[in-house]
Amino acid sequence: MTGSIGQAPAIDKRDFDINRRSSTPHETAAQEDEALLHSRPRSRLSVGNRFSDNDDGLLSDVVEEIVERDRQRMRREVVRVGSFVWGVITCLGAGSITAFSLYGPLLLTRLNYTQLRVNEVSIAAGISMYLPVSLAGYLCDRYSPSPLTLFAGIAFGLGYSLAAFVYKSGPPPDAGGNGWPFWVMVVAFIAIGVATCSMYLAAVTTCAKNFGRGKHKGIILAVPIAAFGLSGMWQSQVGTYFLCERLKDSNCGDVDVYKYFLFLAILLLTIGVIGTFALRIVDDEEEKYIDEAVEELERSGLLAESEFFRPRSEVQAAYGTFSDDHEDNGSVDDQSVTISEELREAARREKEREEEERRKKNWLLNYETRIFLADHTMWWLALGFFLVTGPGEAYLNNLGTIVQTLNLDTTAIVDSHPAGLPSTHVTIIALTSTIARLLTGSLSDLFAPTARRHFTVDQETAGPDPFTKQRPALSRLAFLIPSALLLSLGFLLLASPLPTHHPELSHLTTALVGLGYGSIFSLVPIIISVVWGVENFGTNWGIVAMFPAAGAAMWGVIYSRAYQSAADGSPTDDGQCHGWKCFGFWSIGCTFSVWVAIVAWLVAWTSWRRRGVVV
C-alpha cells in the first residue's frame, strides 16, 4: 500500500514473507539473497528452485537440449559447406571433355581418322553427355547424388582407360593400320559423356538444393558451373606442359594422349569415389522445400483436386488419434500395454510417417514435372538453348582444327604461328567462360528482382507482384540476351574474311564465344531454379539440358561435311583443310541460329512478364 505523496510506501503484512530470516548487520548482500532464495516455499515455481541442488534436473535437461540442437545445426552447416566445396572440386574435374580440341587434331594425324570420324567421336560424347541428363536429374531428385557420383567415377575410369589403349594401338585396320577398330573409341567416349553428365549434375544439384532458397542462389550455382568450364583449361595445360612428348632437345612437343587419358582416368575415378561420401544434401533443407511447395499448392487450391492428398488440416486432425471405442477404454489399455509394445507402436508410426513423406515427395516432384512440361515458356526457353548451345558445342569440339585452318602452311602448329596453339584457345575459352559465369551469377543476384513461386490457378492472368516494383531491378533475361549477342558477334567475326588475313583475331573470336557461351550456361539453370523452383531442379534442368545434344550433333555434322568437302578439293595432300571455305558458311549459319534463339527467349520473357513471373 502506498502512503501520501512524498512519503515512503507502507509495507503491508501481505507483502512480508514469514519464512524469511531476519538479517543481521554482519550479513552480506549475497548471503541475504541466498537466504531469500531458500526461504521461498517449495510448492511454488520460483527462481529458487533452479538454484537448489535437488531441482536442477530440468535446467540441466534444457541446457543439454539446447547444446544438442546447436551441435546438430553446426553439423548440418558443416555438411552443407563441405558438400559445396567438394561439388566445386568435382566440377573442376568433370569438364574434361571440354579439352577435346587439345587432342582432336592428333586423332587426324596419328590415327588417320577423317574429320568426319573425329566429329563422330565428339558427337558421340556430346549426345551421351546430354541425353541422360533428365534421367540423372530424376535420380538426384528422388534419391541422392552419392550413387550417381560413384557411377560417374567408374564410368570415367573405364572410358578414359579404354580410349588410352585404343590410341596406343595406332590407326584402325580400315585406315591402314593394325590398331583397335574405330567403334571402340566411340564406345569409350560414350562412357566419358555419360560420366560427365552424371558427375556434373550430381555436383550442381547438391549445391542447388543445399543453397537454393538463399539470396545468393545465382553465385552459388555459378561457381560450380564456372568450375566445370575451368576444368578444360587446367587439364589442357597439364597435358601440354607435363604430359607431353619430349623432343630431342627435351622441349615439349604434342601432348602424349596415352598418358593424358590415363591421368584423367585415375583422377576422375578418385573424385567419384570421394564424392560418394562428400556430396550430401541436407535432409532438413529438402524436406523444408517439399513442405513449402505442398503448402503453396494447398493455398492455390490445386492440391485439393488430387486423388492422393487430403487437406493438411484433415491429416493433422486424424494423425495420432484413435476411434471412440479406444478412447472409452483408454485407461484400461494404457495399463495393459507393455513398454515393448509401445516401442513397436512408435516404430510403426515412424515408418508410416517416413512412407508418407516419401510418397508426398514423389507425388509432388511428378506433379511439378507435369507442370514444367505443360508450360509453353519452358519450350521457348529450351528452343533458344538448343539454337545457342549447338553452335557453341560445335565450336568447342572443333576448335583445334579451326585454328589449324588459319595457318596456311602444313607444318605443325608452334608458338610462332599467329593463330596460336589449340591449348591456348582452350585456356582462353575456359577463362572467359569462367569469368562470364561468375559475373552473370553475382550480378543477377545483385540486380534481379525478388523471385516468388507462381503456383496460381490462373497463371496467365495473374498480375505482377507489387513488391517487385518498389525498387529498380534488372531481369535475368536482361543478362541472357546480351550474352547471346556476344556469342553471335564471335561467330560473325569468324564468318568475315578478317581471321584468314589476320589469324591473331581468332583469339578474339574464341574470347567472344567463351563469354557468351559461359554466361548462357550459367543463366539458364538459374532461370529454371527461379521460375520453377529447386524441389525438382535436377529433373527440370536435365530436361532442358538434353536439347544441346541434338544441336551439337547437327552443327558438328555440318562443320565436318564442310571441312571434309573443302579438304578434298585442297591442292595439298595432307588431308587437312586451310582457309575460309573450311568454316565460313558454317559460321554464318551459327550466327543466324543464335539470332533466332534470341527471338525465342524474347517470346518467353514476354509471357513471363504477362503472368507476373519474376525472373
From Swiss-Prot:
Residue ranges with Basic and acidic residues bias: 11-20
Predominant localisation class: membrane
Membrane-related topology note: Multi-pass membrane protein
Any GO molecular function: transmembrane transporter activity
Positions of glycan attachment: N112, N329
InterPro entries, per the entry: MFS (IPR011701), MFS_trans_sf (IPR036259)
Keyword Transmembrane helix found: yes
Region spans: Disordered: 1-35
Record-annotated membrane-spanning stretches: 84-104, 120-140, 147-167, 182-202, 218-238, 261-281, 371-391, 428-448, 477-497, 512-532, 538-558, 583-603
Keyword vocabulary terms for this entry: Glycoprotein, Membrane, Transmembrane, Transmembrane helix, Transport, Vacuole
Source domain of life: Eukaryota
Family of this protein: Belongs to the major facilitator superfamily.
Function: Probable transporter.
Stated name of the protein: Probable transporter mch1
Organism: Emericella nidulans (strain FGSC A4 / ATCC 38163 / CBS 112.46 / NRRL 194 / M139) (Aspergillus nidulans)
